[in-house]
């Protein structure tokens, strides 16, 4: 099958449009949370890896944080381990945590490293345990009780939240021009392992590194208004209004809160982008239109 001819005018247009963004973000830190359909579709995985390698080649300091919920669920099903969810979070006993570490720290993490390497990049996979990157604490989940009664605390096992980020190992890898690929597993002061939401880990790492941008890949176009239209740019104040009137709800809420926390914590911009679009990361960074919703710390 003959190759499709390359349109030189289109190529030139793309490069000219990208040049100001490359100049602007060169030397800046970009944290990317890899998840959703982009993690299971083979073509999207390759496109993502190419995007990451190109970002590093043009001088961006890139950190990848990944999830892996569907892959964890698939392996638990294969071994006959039943899964229970509370408020959308997987109840994680010791046996399930072993599976989580195997899948996130092993299978998924190393697959992403291999994908990046296959595109000419130099990636190093690690979990939050490596180099003391993520210190975790147990997540307390409150179950609302009857009116005027104290909420019940539900134990969902080895599910945690970020207590502290020590970026030394990430900074060391970056100084050697490696791309850190982080699995969201943390450990507390007693050595207990916890599975942590990957969006939250990406946001906290972005804060500590004073990142220019946090990119969260999703299975939606971004934040939509009541009529289903994409909202391309939002201030924190406007986000609060949309949450209050119910426009932002359901599964988008945790991602929005993660983006807001990151922006409040010093990240300049947070983006919620459609990971189903090939090369979504480059389109968001290097073009005027982008493919998602931008949340700014302040008007630019």
From Swiss-Prot:
Provide the GO biological process annotations. Answer: arginine biosynthetic process via ornithine; L-arginine biosynthetic process
Q: TM spans, by residue?
A: none
Q: Which residues bind substrate?
A: 68-69, 90, 195
Query: Where does it mainly reside?
Result: cytoplasm
Annotated keywords:
Amino-acid biosynthesis, Arginine biosynthesis, ATP-binding, Cytoplasm, Kinase, Nucleotide-binding, Transferase
Name the EC number(s). 2.7.2.8
Q: Name one GO molecular function term.
A: acetylglutamate kinase activity
Q: Where is this site: Transition state stabilizer?
A: 33, 255
Task: Give the EC class as a word.
Answer: transferase
- Spell out the Pfam families in the cross-references: AA_kinase
State where the protein is found. Cytoplasm
Which CDD domains did the record assign? AAK_NAGK-C (cd04250)
User: Which GO CC terms are listed, alphabetically?
Assistant: cytoplasm
Q: Which reaction does it catalyse?
A: N-acetyl-L-glutamate + ATP = N-acetyl-L-glutamyl 5-phosphate + ADP
Q: What function is annotated for this protein?
A: Catalyzes the ATP-dependent phosphorylation of N-acetyl-L-glutamate.
In terms of HAMAP family, this protein maps to: ArgB (MF_00082)
* Similarity comment text for this entry: Belongs to the acetylglutamate kinase family. ArgB subfamily.
Matching entries from PANTHER family are given as: N-ACETYLGLUTAMATE SYNTHASE (PTHR23342), N-ACETYLGLUTAMATE SYNTHASE, MITOCHONDRIAL (PTHR23342:SF0)
Question: What is the protein name given in its UniProt record?
Answer: Acetylglutamate kinase
């Amino acid at each position: 099958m003959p190759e499709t001819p390359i349109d030189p005018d289109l190529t030139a247009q793309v490069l000219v449009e990208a040049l100001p963004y490359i100049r602007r973000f060169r030397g800046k830190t970009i944290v990317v949370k890899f998840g959703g359909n982009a993690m299971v579709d083979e073509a999207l995985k390759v496109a993502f890896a190419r995007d990451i390698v190109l970002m590093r080649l043009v001088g961006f300091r890139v950190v990848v944080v990944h999830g892996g919920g569907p892959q964890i669920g698939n392996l638990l099903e294969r071994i006959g381990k039943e899964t229970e969810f509370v408020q959308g979070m997987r109840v994680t006993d010791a046996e399930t945590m072993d599976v989580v570490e195997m899948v996130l720290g092993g299978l998924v993490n190393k697959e992403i490293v291999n994908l990046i390497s296959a595109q000419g990049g130099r990636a190093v996979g690690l979990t939050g345990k490596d180099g003391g990157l993520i210190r975790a604490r147990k997540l307390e989940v409150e179950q609302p009780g009857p009116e005027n009664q104290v909420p019940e605390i539900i134990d969902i096992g080895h599910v945690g939240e970020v207590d502290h980020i020590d970026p030394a190992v990430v900074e060391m890898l970056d100084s050697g021009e490696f791309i850190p690929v982080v699995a969201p597993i943390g450990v507390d002061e007693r050595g207990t392992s916890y599975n942590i939401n990957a969006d939250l880990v990406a946001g906290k790492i972005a804060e500590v590194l004073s990142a220019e941008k946090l990119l969260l890949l999703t299975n939606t176009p971004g934040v939509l208004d009541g009529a289903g239209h994409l909202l391309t740019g939002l201030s924190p104040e406007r986000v609060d209004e949309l949450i209050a009137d119910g426009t932002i709800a359901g599964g988008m809420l945790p991602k929005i809160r993660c983006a807001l926390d990151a922006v409040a914590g010093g990240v300049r911009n947070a983006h919620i982008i459609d990971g189903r679009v090939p090369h979504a990361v480059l389109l968001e960074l290097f073009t005027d239109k982008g493919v998602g919703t931008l949340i700014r710390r302040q008007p630019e």
